[in-house]
Amino acid sequence: MAKKIVGYIKLQVPAGKANPSPPIGPALGQRGLNIMEFCKAFNAKTQGMEPGLPIPVVITAFADKSFTFIMKTPPATVLIKKAIKLDKGSSKPHTDKVGTITRAQLEEIAKTKEPDLTAADMDAAVRTIAGTARSMGIVVEGV
């Protein structure tokens, strides 16, 4: 018989830097899950990734206090800022432009994000990422 699911916990945790402090500790503690077990497993899985890169994770909590977790790809905004070496997007995206991104950079980001995107093909994925870049006040070239 399958385990009974008591809930889902969605967090963004920096790669390789999971520790019991907030937000992880309180979120897992409320469900009675072993916080250190999650931290060790998450840090082991993110060992090869760039340290500090925020990784969205969905934790499934079961009635017997066990859990599983699924890691997603980093947010598109983080990948875009990293690609064009930007600290933050524009506070007025349609007026103040803060940078420029090329189609090649967008394709690279779309390949990284492909497992999480619902786009039918690579061109649609690139257009999705381009829309995100535009909403951050970044000029998109070649799309």
From Swiss-Prot:
SUPFAM superfamilies: Ribosomal L11/L12e N-terminal domain, Ribosomal protein L11, C-terminal domain. CDD domains: Ribosomal_L11 (cd00349). GO terms for biological process: translation. SMART domains: RL11. GO terms for cellular component: cytosolic large ribosomal subunit. The keyword Ribonucleoprotein applies. Keywords: Methylation, Ribonucleoprotein, Ribosomal protein, RNA-binding, rRNA-binding. Disulfide bonds: none annotated. InterPro entries: Ribosomal_uL11, Ribosomal_uL11_bac-typ, Ribosomal_uL11_C, Ribosomal_uL11_C_sf, Ribosomal_uL11_CS, Ribosomal_uL11_N, Ribosomal_uL11_N_sf. Pfam families: Ribosomal_L11 (PF00298), Ribosomal_L11_N (PF03946). One or more lysine residues are methylated. One of its GO terms (molecular function) is large ribosomal subunit rRNA binding. It comes from the Bacteria. HAMAP family: Ribosomal_uL11 (MF_00736). Belongs to the universal ribosomal protein uL11 family. NCBIfam families: L11_bact. Part of the ribosomal stalk of the 50S ribosomal subunit. Interacts with L10 and the large rRNA to form the base of the stalk. L10 forms an elongated spine to which L12 dimers bind in a sequential fashion forming a multimeric L10(L12)X complex. Forms part of the ribosomal stalk which helps the ribosome interact with GTP-bound translation factors. This is Large ribosomal subunit protein uL11. The lineage of its organism: Bacteria, Pseudomonadati, Pseudomonadota, Betaproteobacteria, Nitrosomonadales.
